[in-house]
Amino acid sequence: MTAQIIIAVPKGRILKEVLPLFAALGIVPEPAFGDEDSRLLRFATNRSDIGLIRVRAFDVATFVAHGAAQLGIVGSDVLMEFDYSELYAPVDLAIGHCRISVAEPVAMAAGDDPREWSHVRVATKYPNITRRHFEARGVQAECVKLNGAMEIAPVLGLSSRIVDLVSTGRTLKDNGLAEVETIAEVSSRLIVNRAAFKTRAGEIGPLVEGFRRAVEDKNAA
């Protein structure tokens, strides 16, 4: 019996944008998949050859890179941070739009010019992206790795600035921070394990093309 194709999907709000793409491919997950409060990690679909797992965004790339899942949906921020050679990202799904930005306290931003920075201490869950960004400008970046609650770091003196994902900017504003620089625009991508794409091309190839057509049809609508 041929093993299932496993598609890894990140937890959170992106689920609502993923479901229409699955529907366009004729993939219908079990009801619990759309429930953000469900503690299940693995889900069945209407197709016996396709299963889903729902994990943290950073873990999607790891599961696919190591072959535990054959396909995944993940933000381009994760691909920029980890740069796995085992991953192929053939389709920009045009969902999950946001940006990676530098932010600092509003009072500091009022008289600050990023072009004059020579050294920064930054709290972030993206140390690799942050270092590369500042190194390219000749700025020394000291990164404090956090997995969440970045916005409170400047308040408590852990760092003077943060680098984080920004969507509406509401969370920054609520915590007295101002966005001062955009590092990169972010959207969700379909990723594929390179080895699986070669060995199971007959199964994976049509799925990749299905996602591509779904995005094209959505953009044309």
Curated annotation (Swiss-Prot):
One of its GO terms (molecular function) is ATP binding. It is found in: Cytoplasm. Gene3D superfamilies: Periplasmic binding protein-like II. SUPFAM superfamilies: Periplasmic binding protein-like II (SSF53850). It catalyses: 1-(5-phospho-beta-D-ribosyl)-ATP + diphosphate = 5-phospho-alpha-D-ribose 1-diphosphate + ATP. InterPro entries: ATP_PRibTrfase_cat (IPR013820), ATP_PRibTrfase_CS (IPR018198), ATP_PRibTrfase_HisG (IPR001348), ATP_PRibTrfase_HisG_short (IPR024893). Pfam families: HisG. Its EC number is 2.4.2.17. GO terms for cellular component: cytoplasm. It is an enzyme of class 2 (transferase). Keywords: Amino-acid biosynthesis, ATP-binding, Cytoplasm, Glycosyltransferase, Histidine biosynthesis, Nucleotide-binding, Transferase. GO terms for biological process: L-histidine biosynthetic process. Pathway: Amino-acid biosynthesis; L-histidine biosynthesis; L-histidine from 5-phospho-alpha-D-ribose 1-diphosphate: step 1/9. NCBIfam families: hisG. Lacks the C-terminal regulatory region which is replaced by HisZ. Catalyzes the condensation of ATP and 5-phosphoribose 1-diphosphate to form N'-(5'-phosphoribosyl)-ATP (PR-ATP). Has a crucial role in the pathway because the rate of histidine biosynthesis seems to be controlled primarily by regulation of HisG enzymatic activity. Belongs to the ATP phosphoribosyltransferase family. Short subfamily. Heteromultimer composed of HisG and HisZ subunits. This is ATP phosphoribosyltransferase.
